[in-house]
Amino acid sequence: MAKNTKEAALEYHSQGKPGKIEVVPTKPYSTQRDLSLAYSPGVAEPCLEIEKDSEAAYDYTAKGNLVAVISNGTAVLGLGDIGALAGKPVMEGKGLLFKIFAGIDVFDIEINEKDPEKFIQIVKGIADRKSVGRERV
């Protein structure tokens, strides 16, 4: 007998590793040298290049293929105001769709702020205004 939608949905979301998205390394990390290039001291070099030219961030970081899905949980897919944490499965689901259909990596960010102006200020503080709505070809 088929499970009802609630049981099937809860099983889907709880099976295996929790969540629907993860961060996976794109560079080698198996040796001491790899780790020192990935972090300290090697990471300083791309930082200094980006400091000189912000466009270099697209060459040395995931910036060109990474978006944030940001929500405060006040208007979640017909569920209404369920709060930031309760909306997280929806934000992860959006991240999954971005990844499988467009190859775009996502960080979901849930913000506990219901005041619209404060929420906007928080998001503005996170965003790099030079890259908002911008495509790099």
Report residues per predicted region.
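N-terminal ligand-binding/catalytic initiation module
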Residues: 1-134
